Regions:
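Catalytic cores of alpha/beta
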Residues: 58-67, 100-115
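Glycine-rich beta-to-alpha transition loops that act as phosphate-gripper elements at the mouths
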Residues: 35, 52-58, 76, 95-104, ...
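Solvent-exposed alpha-helices and their adjacent loops that cap or buttress functional pockets
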Residues: 25, 88-89, 109-110
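Glycine-enriched alpha-helix->loop->beta-strand junction motifs that scaffold or abut catalytic
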Residues: 47-51, 67-72, 92, 110-117
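Long alpha-helical, hydrophobic tracts
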Residues: 57-59, 69-71, 88
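Conserved N-terminal beta1-alpha1 strand-loop-helix module at the mouth
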Residues: 1-66
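Active-site-adjacent beta->alpha loops and helix N-cap segments on the catalytic face
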Residues: 31-46, 73-91, 103, 123-130
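Glycan-processing catalytic domains of CAZymes
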Residues: 8-9, 108-130
């Protein structure tokens, strides 16, 4: 299970972007994060970028997977549904559910979700991911 944002687990820096200009201003080979956006998905795919994308629906997740998102981030109820779909279709993208503390890790593991990301990471400009 992947854990992103825990103090005990190292993780590589990533940046939140809202547009293509933001992406162009990131360091080469850096990981980027954005809310689902068709333009950013296409750009990231064709530029062969590593990215995380926040989705709100199964449809958005299907598109994110097809554009090779490294991680698809969503709320827990959606994550449970997406994990079954991802497993069935053998997506390369990993499903991450949003958690508030390490107390939530056992629940995520029992639900067999690929991983978890701490909510506080999604509220600031620069984060770390491994």
């Amino acid at each position: 299970m992947k854990i992103i944002g825990d103090n005990l687990v190292p993780f590589k820096a990533f940046s939140k972007v809202t547009g293509i200009e933001d992406i162009k201003n990131t360091k080469p080979n850096s990981m980027i994060f954005f809310d689902f956006n068709e333009e950013l998905l296409k750009y990231s795919f064709f530029q062969h970028l590593n990215f995380l994308v926040y989705v709100k629906s199964i449809k958005e997740a299907i598109y994110a997977s097809n554009f090779n998102a490294k991680y698809i981030i969503c709320e827990n109820e959606l994550a449970k549904k997406l994990q079954k779909i991802a497993d069935n279709y053998m997506w390369d993208s990993k499903i991450l559910t949003i958690i508030k503390s390490s107390d939530d890790l056992e629940k995520v593991a029992l639900e067999e979700i690929d991983g978890a990301i701490y909510s506080d990471l999604l509220e600031i400009k620069v984060w770390k991911i491994f």
